[in-house]
Swiss-Prot record:
GO terms for molecular function: DNA-binding transcription factor activity; transcription cis-regulatory region binding. Transmembrane segments: none annotated. Pfam families: LacI, Peripla_BP_1. PANTHER family: HTH-TYPE TRANSCRIPTIONAL REGULATOR GALS, LACI-RELATED TRANSCRIPTIONAL REPRESSOR. InterPro entries: Cro/C1-type_HTH (IPR001387), HTH_LacI (IPR000843), Lambda_DNA-bd_dom_sf (IPR010982), Peripla_BP/Lac1_sug-bd_dom (IPR001761), Peripla_BP_I (IPR028082). It comes from the Bacteria. Keywords: DNA-binding, Transcription, Transcription regulation. Residues 5-24 bind DNA. The keyword Cell cycle does not apply. This is Uncharacterized HTH-type transcriptional regulator YcjW. GO terms for biological process: DNA damage response; DNA-templated transcription; negative regulation of DNA-templated transcription; regulation of DNA-templated transcription. The gene is ycjW. CDD domains: HTH_LacI (cd01392), PBP1_LacI_sugar_binding-like (cd06267). The lineage of its organism: Bacteria, Pseudomonadati, Pseudomonadota, Gammaproteobacteria, Enterobacterales. Residues 1-57 form the HTH lacI-type domain.
Length: 332
């Protein structure tokens, strides 16, 4: 028969309420009593019943991670796998489970979130991207549960927080660098404009062109979608145009990889015939030859900081509404 909290109390020589406070991670207990309880738990190999604890206390020790996109559109995207790894590692340190939420559309996402909140299955939410339509945030904000978004949050909310990089400013700086190196005909291969990050990166590119009195050519601003297939199709389309752009600004890793492959197919030498820059990471810079210049996205740090912020909020500690993570630009 599995040991109970009564057994722990007997072995530790403390009351049942003291054992309960330790299991629920409450602070109103002496270090000596806590140590006795922890030793008894280890000796008895006690495994708490999470369902029973959830029904009799403040809920499960779990957080939810939402991609806000279908698994089809996130498969193969290194950003999501890397940031999720950072989040799960931090949650494990805190003794929390991670529920990965997937769905077909925002309405289904919201329905699943509300269901888990009402059932006390989660104590916080991390969103891996920030939709340009913030109605999702407004709906979640009605609940007394912290939500941390990896991305920009424009509206004012009581329970919605942001961890992001300066995508607009970084894109201006990156396009400025291309122009200052002598390029005038610069194309942009971007992700769909239904998320803040894509909007900010494309707007930063356009702002830089305007500041240098370079006309924006609509045919050189191409939506590469969310998958490898759509990105490669868009890259091939872009590199089939005449005249060919001198440089391409890619707004994420998938677009960078697609430009490299399309250029190889068409025997276009990088960087001799086509300069390529974009948002990348150390792994991609190691794979692609020559390594692309651009903005190194601090994926691990975004995941870690978002998780640390969420656990501060869960603990009731004062926390900033917005955190901006610094990036690093490298030009090859």
């Amino acid at each position: 028969m599995s040991p109970t909290i009564y057994d722990i109390a007997r072995v530790a020589g403390v009351s049942k309420s003291t054992v309960s406070r330790v299991l629920n991670k409450q602070t109103n207990i002496s270090p000596e009593a806590r140590e006795k309880v922890l030793r008894a738990i280890e000796e008895l190999q006690y495994q708490p019943n999470k369902l029973a604890r959830a029904l009799t206390s403040s809920g499960f020790d779990a957080i939810m991670v939402i991609s806000t996109r279908s698994t089809k559109t996130t498969a193969g995207n290194p950003f999501f796998s890397e940031v999720l790894h950072a989040i799960t590692a931090k949650a494990e340190e805190e003794g929390f489970d991670v529920i990965l939420q997937t769905s077909h559309n925002p309405a289904e996402d919201l329905q699943k979130c509300e269901s888990k909140i009402k059932q006390k299955m989660i104590k916080g939410i991390i969103m891996l991207s920030s939709p340009a339509d913030e109605s999702f945030f407004a709906q979640l904000d009605k609940y007394d549960i912290p939500v941390v978004v990896i991305g920009k949050v424009e509206g004012q909310y009581a329970h919605v927080y942001s961890v992001d990089t300066d995508n607009f400013g970084d894109s201006i700086a990156l396009t400025d660098a291309l122009i200052e190196s002598g390029h005038q005909n610069i194309a942009c291969l971007h992700a769909p404009l239904d998320v803040h990050v894509s909007v900010d990166r494309v707007n930063g590119y356009k702002q830089s062109l305007a500041a240098h009195n370079i006309a924006v050519r609509d045919e050189w601003i191409v939506d590469g979608g969310y998958t490898h297939e759509t990105a490669l199709k868009a890259a091939r389309q872009l590199l089939s145009q005449s005249p060919l752009p001198e440089a391409v600004f890619a707004t994420d890793s998938l677009k960078l990889m697609s430009i490299y492959r399309a250029a190889a197919e068409k025997n276009i030498a990088i960087p001799q015939q086509l300069a390529v820059v974009g948002y990348s990471n150390e792994t991609l810079s190691f794979i692609l030859t020559p390594a692309p210049g651009g903005i190194d996205v601090p994926t691990q740090e975004l995941g870690q900081q978002s998780c640390e912020l969420l656990f501060r909020l869960i603990s009731g500690k004062p926390s900033p509404q917005n955190i901006t993570v610094a990036t690093h630009m490298t030009l090859k």
